[in-house]
Amino acid sequence: MISAQNLVYSLQGRRLTDNVSLTFPGGEIVAILGPNGAGKSTLLRQLTGYLQPDSGECRLFNKPLNEWSITELAKHRAVMRQNSHMAFPFSVQEVIQMGRHPHRTGNQDNETAQIMALCDCQALANRDYRQLSGGEQQRVQLARLLVQLWEPTPSPKWLFLDEPTSALDIHHQQHLFRLLRQLVHERQFNVCCVLHDLNLAARYADRIVLMQKGKVIANGKPQDVLTQQALTMLYGADITVLEDPANHSPLIVLDH
């Protein structure tokens, strides 16, 4: 479980998170949605311990984040940021194996190879990471995070992803979310991601959090949260919300 209680964070007089309280029980894919500047990435950084709130508290497995050591926290949660540039000529395989650093147990070549296959990175193994496309880099970073969290026996872990599909083609978007769902069901992973694609969130997320101006304005199942009224108010766009006949999830269409 991860929880946030009364999170407040301000920058240059502007509240980026404004008294945010949330509890994610686990066993879910959570999608945080909202317009640009809503506070989504700021909230994610606070939930992961990268950004200390001005007031309020975050807890992971009922323990305050500031009471975790850096090493132990890294074994239980992993974070993909929006940008993951590197200045040095590491190979893809070397980048992925960096994920094992908190465990100090060597490279674990078998697990690394398994995870590279899961993330469709085998063909990239010997490439210079800096020469990859944005989408290829996102796949490599996901593999690094899984190597960081992987244990021989599945145990609860948290995976935080900030716009993980921003550079992915449609095939790899689908592959990513199918993999995340598999990890939730088979490996006791919990996933929290910031997204802009409303239809991806509607199709794959178990829980949707809507943010506006630093506040959480809705939190619940996609069919309860992604309504035409709520989305029109939030984004100021002319849209129609239909029902996907395949799975009864919301289907968001931009009007002409």
UniProtKB/Swiss-Prot annotation:
It is a peripheral membrane protein. One of its GO terms (cellular component) is plasma membrane. InterPro entries: AAA+_ATPase (IPR003593), ABC_transporter-like_ATP-bd (IPR003439), ABC_transporter-like_CS (IPR017871), P-loop_NTPase (IPR027417). ATP binds at residues 34-41. Part of the ABC transporter complex HmuTUV involved in hemin import. Responsible for energy coupling to the transport system. Pfam families: ABC_tran. Its EC number is 7.6.2.-. The complex is composed of two ATP-binding proteins (HmuV), two transmembrane proteins (HmuU) and a solute-binding protein (HmuT). Residues 2-238 form the ABC transporter domain. The lineage of its organism: Bacteria, Pseudomonadati, Pseudomonadota, Gammaproteobacteria, Enterobacterales. It is an enzyme of class 7 (translocase). This is Hemin import ATP-binding protein HmuV. It comes from Shigella dysenteriae serotype 1 (strain Sd197). Keywords: ATP-binding, Cell inner membrane, Cell membrane, Membrane, Nucleotide-binding, Translocase, Transport. One of its GO terms (molecular function) is ATP binding. Transmembrane segments: none annotated.
